[in-house]
Amino acid sequence: MSKRKLGHDGNSHELDEEEEEEEEDDDDELIHSTQDQDRPHKQQRVENGKQMTPTKQHQQQQQQQPISNGRLKKLKAQSSDEESGSSEDDDEDVEDVDSSGSDSGSSDDDDDDDDDDDDDDGNSEDEREAVRREQQLKSGVTEPEAGIIESITLENFMCHRHFKLDFCSNVNFIAGENGSGKSAVLIALIVCLGAKAGFTNRGSKLSDLVKAETNTAVITVKLRNQGQEAFKPEKYGKSVIIERRISRTGSSGYKVKDYNGKTVSDKFNDVSLILEQFNIQIDNPMSILTQDTSRQFLNSAGPQDKYKSFLMATQLDKMTKDYTTIREHIDKIKDMLSQKVVVIQELEKKVREYNKEYKDLQQMVGLERKISEFKNQLAWSFVVESEREAKRKEKQVAEAEERSFDNDIRKVDETIETYNKSIEDIKKDIKEFTDQIKIQEQKKETNNREILTIEREEAKIQTQIEANNKKRQQRKQRRHLQLQSINEIKERNAQLANNQSKLDEIKKKGQQKLQLEARKEELIKEKEDLMRDRENLKRDHQNQRTITQQMNREYEGLRVQLNNLRSTQKGENQAYGKGMTDFLHKIEASRRNFSKLPIGPIGLSLKIKNESWAFAIESAISKATLRNFLVFSIPDGITLQKLGHQFGIKVDYTKIPETTEVYKTVEHDELDPSLATVLRVLDSPSHFIINFLIDTKKVEQIGLGNDRKEIDSVLYTDRCPRGLSQFFDPQGNNYSKTKSGNPFYQAAKNSGEATMLRVNSDAAIQRTQRDMESKLPALNQQKKIEQELSSDVQAIEHKISQNDQDQNQCSRKILQITNEIKSIEDTLVQQTDDYSELEIGLASLDEEIKSMDEEINIQKAQRTEVAAQKGPFAENNRALDDQIDVLSNQLGNIENNLRKFNEGLRKLNNNKQALLQQQGRSAQERDQFKAEYQRILEIVKEKTDKATQICERIEIPTNETNTTLTNKIIQYTKQLEKESRGKRSRTEALKLFQDANNSLKEISEQRDNIEELATILERNLNERYKKWQRFRLSISRRSDQYFNIFLSKKGYTGSLTFDHQNGKLDINVELQKALPSNQNGTAKGDTKGLSGGERSFSTVSLLLAFWENMECPFRAMDEFDVFMDEVNRSISINLLMSKAEENRSKQYIFVTPLALNHIKTSEYVKVFRVRAPVRTGGDVTVETD
């Protein structure tokens, strides 16, 4: 396997595996970096002709990596290898290009000394390069590099609605009139590959590049992915497609697709890896020279800016930064060595002091020996005492085994058996009496059935009697009515003369009734209109009343807030409760009662860097948390609550761990520095409070935004950093996401000023007073509007009530007239027939009534006869009831006896259960005694083992006990302490001496290792920096040579004067045309004095010189010929074409406003002619040659 190498001719060469391994070892020696295992990270530096730029991650690893002895040995070995082969490296690492001129800008002595040595190598290198290119041309076209642009597509970007170009692999010209949008192609290219809006000089933000009247712009760039430098070809195929979408709202996103258009990733990190693999330098202005850069480069750029462009184009600036970082790290190592020297001096002093102290303590042995004897006796005295306790427990076990409850349980079982037999006999008697009672009840049931049959017959007869009585009554009623009708007919016949006057009265009253009904209909319609008006007024009144209540609540809230602020102004502590000041004084006075002084209330120790966030932070943290106290132990918290109770303050506290500093959160490493969070806005002198808020409230994950628009642009887009969970605005409103990722908004419960977190109470009071004064007129006006609507509602309610009264009056009059008409109609006399038939029917009814009376008397006699049949059966039932009562009484007595026996049996069972429990407890007690006996035996064994470890068993004097021996040990120990007071023990002194001596050896070894490592690093860095200087000199000379060669195509001469020490680059161009024969050149050297065409041609020549040292697979330049005449343009184009033809593996893109009709197209040359788009929309027309 081989890798590409940057040669001095700007082209890629192959490195074999052996060279690659040597360079990787050198990388480890210099920066101790480890390559990321997840992606193919290309390191670029100046080492054996290869470029390597360590990333920030490598620098951080270098600073944090500990220095081990193994690494030190490796560095020593590498250093010795480098020293032995340094002469060879100096000859092989840098191959300079032969320069006919001198580097007039180089003021570095080292550079001047190496000029002669490098010239010879440069000549051979040019010859080899010329031969290589000639062989390529003869053998065929070189394969295009991976990373060249195959096509680019623009949708709704700048002036283009839809625009696509398919590039060839070598030379591409994009021609078009001014305003045709040809420059937008290069802008789209750099934007799609990751550039920011400011880099394009076409707007302050990316959304400015979205086409007018559209919402989203899409740029798609297709890159070649073939060859040795292909990026994961098995995954992406022969092309990689990068798509970037830009929204009008300012958001943007990436998609990385394979050859078939399938999305593989949507992360910018993958885009960066692809650009790094292809060596595409999108931030290098020399790689893609835009219109503005092209016009201003030679005009306005100063020597320093031009030198920076040179470094950026050749990537030397990245290596400069890397060497600077390593130099800073070496300086830090030297600072560390200085600190180690101070520590070693202190440790040497302590070692001497501890050694002297130990030698002074070699005495006082007699008392210690006596104390040791007493301690031995004390150890065995505990054994003797435990052995006595074991004997007592052994006796208790024997006594417990002698106790037994078996005889008592057997007697109770015998009595229970006797009771069970008696209960069985009683149950038999109960069954016998129960059977007799059932027989008597069956007989009674038979009698009852007979009685029921008789009663049914009796009821049937009674029903017939009642039916006949009903018919008789009906006949009598008909007779009465018929008789009444006869009399009425006779009376009406006498009144027929009065009918006409009554009919006239009925007609008159009918007209009055019609008039009243019409009036009632009018009143009903009027009421419906009034009801609608009333509903509308009520709705308006309710709305205005709601508004009034809301405004009143806001005004009262401001009043309460003003009172709170005034209370806060009187005393900052009063905002946390009455008596808080005295309570805090009491805590300070009682600090001895605490293991460590409590902290709180938390809010008193918090300061806000910007007062505008006070209410938002108070809402996010909560007032309850601000009132909280922090303690370091539970007893401290209990003591704190007791003190608070004395002042009527309920104390809430939280136990916190001991820490030494604020948590090292990842927030400051990941979040945008311009993004405000609660943690960044807060400040406190106590790191315990900050850590507590991080643990309980996650203040590092709560963002702050000025308004909803600003918060939405961060929280609900891809810009939202991972871990940022919610936002608050200055009004205390909360913005967050649900579990499914949907937006969630929660308005603040109370709005206004913060009362606990304050910076300026006077300003807050004045603001609150101004708010109250501004709201009061509107509140009074709103109350007036509500009162007017209330009066209107009452007025219309009165109209509705009056309408109801009018309707009721009409209804009463209509009813009265209706009744009067009915009464008159009832008095009208109708002509009737003869009533003789009615008199005949009356006689017939009299006969029917008489016949029914006779039938009813017969049925009553039958009923009396049937009722007499029930007597014998009822008498028999009474006798059966007497027998059942006697049997029931006897059965009750037997059942009472059964209950008594059952109760006795229950008591016996309880007694037996109690005996069984006592027996169980006795067995449990016996087992407990045995277990205790075994436990004491184990204690005896354990104490014996411990005592044996101290000494062999010794006899304890009979007059000695644990107490007496302990007292003697204390007495002798006090005497020993008295004699050795103010001195350490020999053991402690020896340990201190040994620890200090070991620390001294360890730190001395560390100092030697670090000092040796710093020497190796500094020597290696100096050697590499010298190589880099020679490499820089080689590149600058080659750039100067190529610049002069390219200028000579038009008969110009020029030079690039480098001042590496001061970072300056001066460009000189001298014209040699149209000169008198007696002159050798013009004095025109400053590029600002050149004409537009001359300056453009010089720019092309300089850029081509820089391009010779670039590895980017494609180059682009906008309006390179804008100020040239036809001659300059022809020479410039021929120069560009010839350079492109020499290097078919690279791709060139040139943008020009001219037609380029003379350009001959081929497989390797393509011309795109862009017509101006219609600004209101439409596709761009492209003609391709």
From Swiss-Prot:
Start and end residues of each stretch annotated as Flexible hinge: 571-807
Positions with biased composition (Basic and acidic residues): 35-48
Coiled-coil ranges (or none): 337-570, 808-1024
This protein's GO CC annotations: nucleus; site of double-strand break; Smc5-Smc6 complex
GO biological process, one term: double-strand break repair via homologous recombination
An annotated Gene Ontology molecular function: damaged DNA binding
Residue numbers binding ATP: 176-183
Region annotation (Disordered) ranges: 1-144
Gene3D superfamilies in UniProt: P-loop containing nucleotide triphosphate hydrolases (3.40.50.300)
Main location: nucleus
Top-rank taxon: Eukaryota
Record's keyword terms, sorted: ATP-binding, Chromosome, Coiled coil, DNA damage, DNA recombination, DNA repair, Nucleotide-binding, Nucleus
Domain observations: The flexible hinge domain, which separates the large intramolecular coiled coil regions, allows the heterotypic interaction with the corresponding domain of smc5, forming a V-shaped heterodimer.
Subunit structure: Forms a heterodimer with smc5.
Name of the protein in question: Structural maintenance of chromosomes protein 6
Source organism: Dictyostelium discoideum
Phylogenetic lineage: Eukaryota, Amoebozoa, Evosea, Eumycetozoa, Dictyostelia
Gene that this polypeptide is encoded by: smc6
